[in-house]
């Protein structure tokens, strides 16, 4: 519908600017290409505690890619990975999109990896009804980007700490 027209425009622009782009499913054999891309991504982004936590989480996901049964997709242009997304099925209705990275200097790269990953997941798991785009980590820009996809609902996030009895 009309509410996602801006996203379609970004994807159309990306396709015009990168007519030879391709997607490739992430496998243990090509996972290093995602590691390399995310390393470059972090080189150009300002460090903060949330970035450090995310970096650690992504490294762990890469280290345990097969054991965690994650799905992943890379967006490739001119032989270079310019975006990737990874996630895992939560149950028969929900899919968790854990990580999404793209070079923001490439117009439409985020919208395109989001679209292509969503299509791949919809094809692989046709029974799914919801994609969980996860937490915005309190970042206004990330929150705005996630809300631009017109989510069905936003859930409150809670942290729990285990306390010793006594």
Task: Locate the predicted segments by residue.
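Acyltransferase donor/substrate-recognition loop-hinge adjacent to the catalytic core
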Residues: 1-47
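Short, contiguous, pocket-lining structural segments
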Residues: 2, 6, 26-33, 53, ...
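C-terminal "cap" of GNAT-fold acetyltransferases
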Residues: 5-8, 162-166
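Short, hydrophobic/aromatic alpha-helical segments in well-folded domains
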Residues: 10, 37, 57-61, 116-117, ...
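A generic secondary-structure signal
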Residues: 13, 40, 61-64, 120-124
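A structural signal for short coil/turn segments at secondary-structure junctions
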Residues: 18, 66-68, 125-126
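Short, conserved active-site entrance elements at the starts or edges of catalytic domains
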Residues: 33-81
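Aromatic (often tryptophan-rich) hydrophobic motifs at membrane interfaces
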Residues: 72-163
């Amino acid at each position: 519908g009309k509410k996602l027209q801006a996203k379609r425009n970004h994807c159309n622009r990306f396709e015009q600017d990168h007519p030879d782009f391709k997607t490739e499913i992430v496998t243990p054999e090509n996972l290093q290409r995602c590691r390399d891309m995310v390393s470059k991504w972090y080189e150009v982004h300002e460090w903060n505690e949330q970035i450090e936590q995310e970096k650690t989480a992504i490294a762990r996901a890469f280290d345990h890619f097969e054991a965690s049964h994650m799905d992943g997709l890379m967006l490739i242009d001119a032989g270079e990975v310019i975006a990737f997304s990874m996630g895992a099925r939560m149950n028969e209705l929900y899919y968790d999109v854990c990580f999404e990275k793209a070079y923001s200097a490439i117009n439409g790269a985020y919208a395109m990896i989001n679209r292509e990953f969503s299509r791949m997941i919809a094809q692989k798991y046709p029974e799914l009804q919801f994609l969980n785009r996860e937490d915005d980590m309190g970042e206004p820009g990330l929150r705005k980007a996630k809300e631009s996809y017109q989510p069905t609902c936003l859930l409150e996030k809670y942290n729990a700490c285990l306390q010793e009895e006594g």
